[in-house]
Design a protein with these regions (language model features):
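The catalytic "switch" region of P-loop NTPases
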Residues: 1-3, 31, 176-346
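A short, basic N-terminal segment
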Residues: 1-47, 389-418
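P-loop NTPase nucleotide-binding core
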Residues: 48-53, 57, 61-222, 362, ...
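Glycine- and acidic
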Residues: 16-22, 52, 80, 196-200, ...
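Eukaryote-specific, cytoplasm-facing alpha-helical/coiled-coil scaffolding segments in long proteins
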Residues: 61, 124-126, 237, 399-408
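Short amphipathic C-terminal alpha-helix that caps PH/PH-like domains
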Residues: 94-102, 253, 326-330, 376
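C-terminal alpha-helical "lid" subdomain
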Residues: 165-181, 301-305, 315-418
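Short, well-ordered alpha-helical packing segments
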Residues: 35-38, 67, 95, 99, ...
Length: 418
């Protein structure tokens, strides 16, 4: 594992590309719950979850953990972040970006997923016969059979995929690319080209969820465990300018929630991550749209955790969690930079954590991991590169305290929420 890249990403306030599960301290119950959810989704279930956490509590980090688990279990995953360019009231744009962001453990893009599947069918046909015409026929039959359930849901989606294979065999690569572009939601395809691969119309706000349902069925039918869609910074919905636009966005969330419960989606997991304001704000948050709020709100007034609720809270770290994560970071740093930190850092580890907990005292001892992680790695980097300078442990503690003060004064503009 590339510890140096992981440490660099964390120091910069970003979520590492890999290895995050190793650092998912204090979230064991949540991780176990999502392991179970992914197993249920593999068995035809469709589920929607909302993650509620303060900025810096680790929502994006936890989404990355879910992503890694999903890849390990052979899911196709898409991660989108809501923004001005991807507002949830424009569900057709959301669909396009979900498809654009598709990944599996072997590669990226819907094109890769389709081509890899067809290549596998061609290899099977090649093993059965050496006759090229019979091979093509076997592949066409296998494609037709694999798309049976998708075809029942939306014939156009299946038709575009079947036509793509046929057009590739005919070496009409231009139209074949149009067929894949149409599946991705491209609305700039000439009518004459769409007619060649047997479809009409485009992905619109009226049918985008229907296309998303077809996509979930398709990826399962060709051998994947299902579809996982991770939607970060869902609180952006509150920034939509009018109540009408926000209501449209919340209604699409409700549609996805209902369609999962009604069985219209299969083998699908949708995870929305947001700050508490989305769930609490009466004027602009989910409570402002009763139809969604009624489905999500907790009827029990209790602080006891319940992982099976639609919304689960991602709490800040406690001192024990910080001790555990700092211990892991210390080991990673020693391995990455080939030095012995035990003499200078281990004796004051409890003091370092204590400083951070004291600084976060206003939160009742619950702390967000991001500031601590960034400060701690900065100190490790500084001490490792200047070992002869640090004669006194108090000097190290002062560096940590100063770094924390700097980070707390920053206006955080990172896209990733550790």
């Amino acid at each position: 594992m590339d510890y140096e890249n992981i440490l660099m990403a964390l120091k910069n306030g970003n979520v590492p590309e890999s290895g995050v599960k190793e650092l998912c301290i204090g979230r064991e119950k949540q991780v176990n719950e999502f392991e179970k959810l992914l197993d249920k989704v593999d068995n035809k279930k469709a589920i929607v979850k909302f993650i509620n956490g303060e900025f810096g509590a680790g929502k994006s980090f936890f989404l990355k953990v879910i992503e890694e688990m999903a890849y390990d279990k052979n899911f196709v995953v898409s991660w989108i972040t809501l923004s001005n360019d991807i507002p949830f009231n424009k569900i057709d744009i959301v669909y396009k970006n979900i498809v654009k962001s598709l990944k599996c453990k072997t590669g990226t893009s819907l094109s890769h997923i389709i081509d890899r599947w067809i290549t596998g069918l061609k290899m099977e046909a090649f093993e059965e016969t050496s006759n090229p015409q019979k091979q093509n026929q076997l592949v066409q039959e296998a494609i037709y059979d694999d798309l049976a359930e998708t075809r029942e849901h939306t014939s156009a989606f299946a038709m575009a995929i079947e036509s793509y294979n046929k057009l590739m065999n005919e070496e009409d690569y231009k139209t074949a690319e149009y067929a894949k572009a149409w599946l991705r939601g491209d609305s700039n395809i000439p009518f004459t080209e769409k007619r060649k691969f047997g479809v009409k119309g485009d992905v619109t706000k009226e049918n985008a969820i229907h296309f998303l349902e077809a996509l979930s069925i398709f990826v399962k039918s060709i051998g994947y465990s299902g579809l996982v869609v991770l939607i970060d910074e869902a609180e952006f919905t509150m920034n939509l300018h009018t109540k009408k636009l926000r209501d449209v966005a919340y209604n699409y969330m409700r549609d996805i929630y209902d369609n999962c419960n009604l069985g219209k989606f299969e083998n699908s997991l949708f995870v929305f991550a947001a700050t508490p304001e989305l769930f609490d704000n009466q004027k602009k948050g989910i409570p402002s749209y009763e139809a969604l709020d009624d489905r999500l709100k907790d009827v029990l007034d209790t602080d006891l955790p319940d992982m099976r609720k639609p919304i689960f809270d991602l709490k800040g770290f406690e001192k024990k969690d910080l001790m555990d994560v700092s211990g892991k970071l210390l080991i990673m740093h020693e391995e990455a930079y080939k030095w012995n930190a035990s003499d200078k850092i281990n004796p004051i580890l409890d003091d370092i954590v204590g400083i951070h907990v004291e600084n976060a005292g206003l939160t009742g001892g619950k702390v967000t991991p991001r500031t601590f992680i960034r400060s701690f790695i900065s100190v490790l980097d500084t001490v490792q590169q200047n070992q002869s300078y640090f004669k006194d442990s108090n000097e190290i503690l002062q560096v940590f305290n100063d770094r924390e003060a700097e980070l707390n004064e920053e206006i955080d503009e990172f896209d990733d929420d550790w």
